[in-house]
């Protein structure tokens, strides 16, 4: 995308840990940032109106470290994929056989930064909905990136999944050798992925998921034990257990 335009919603121009900001990352990459929509509402029409001959990609960034609630609207990866396939005037009839290559002919990629990298449905455990990597790939995103630690539960690394054509292009980039993960990191990621072959095993073996999905009664029991031990010490400060909503991260 060097020298080309990357279209991003204004509501997704996030700053992550370490003061890294999406606009600055894009600038360093050589891409030209093109903002659309507003902080709280962005529609598919905003993306369509911003497309030009210089457009190389639609970038969707999941706001995993904050929320905008209330009068809001956003565009899904699936909608962006559908838009990218409709931007090219086909000279042949679109059939199931050539549909896969239709997006590639338009020349506009759909790239999504998921951040935490969830592989299971957290709603099954009473937690807020988070888009999974599988859902976004199935929705049509050409490349999905996420962290190897955080909710994924592995080593600190960046993970890229997507269409083979684009992953291969990144494999052949001159910077790969300097940025590639070492063997220990790769081994750690592989072992975590093996856990995900069985969701129940993943929830039990991966510390982050185990703590996030721990039943409320179990948490209460542990809290009561800690409080009792503290209070039995005769400290001047007494502890009591109360119901609350905790935040992870």
Language-model segment annotations:
Residues 1-196, 231:
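Conserved PLP-enzyme active-site core in the AAT-like
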Residues 147, 204, 238-242:
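Short, conserved beta-strand edge motifs with alternating hydrophobic and charged residues
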Residues 167-170, 199-203, 237:
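Short, structured loop/turn "capping" segments at alpha-beta junctions
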Residues 196-226:
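Structural signature of PLP-dependent enzymes
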């Amino acid at each position: 995308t060097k020298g080309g335009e990357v279209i991003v919603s204004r509501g997704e121009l996030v700053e992550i840990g370490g003061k890294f900001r999406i606009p600055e990352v894009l600038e360093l990459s050589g891409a030209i940032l093109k903002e659309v929509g507003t902080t709280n509402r962005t529609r598919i029409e905003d993306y369509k109106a911003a497309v030009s001959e210089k457009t190389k990609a639609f970038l969707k960034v999941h706001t995993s470290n904050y929320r905008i609630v209330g009068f809001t609207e956003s565009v899904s990866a699936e909608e962006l994929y559908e838009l990218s396939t409709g931007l090219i005037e086909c000279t042949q009839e679109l059939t199931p056989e050539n549909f896969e290559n239709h997006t590639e002919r338009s020349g506009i990629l759909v790239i999504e930064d998921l951040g935490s990298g969830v592989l299971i449905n957290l709603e099954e455990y009473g937690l807020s909905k988070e888009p999974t990597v599988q859902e976004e790939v199935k929705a049509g995103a050409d490349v999905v990136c996420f962290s190897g630690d955080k909710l994924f539960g592995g080593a600190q690394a960046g993970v890229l999944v997507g269409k083979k054509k684009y992953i291969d292009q990144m494999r052949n980039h001159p910077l790969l050798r300097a940025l590639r993960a070492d063997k220990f990191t790769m081994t750690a990621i592989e072992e975590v992925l093996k856990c995900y072959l069985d969701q129940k095993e993943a929830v039990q073996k991966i510390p982050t998921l185990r703590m996030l999905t721990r039943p409320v009664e179990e948490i209460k029991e542990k809290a009561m034990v800690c409080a009792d031990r503290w209070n039995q010490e005769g400290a001047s400060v007494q502890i009591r257990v109360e119901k609350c909503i905790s935040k992870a991260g």
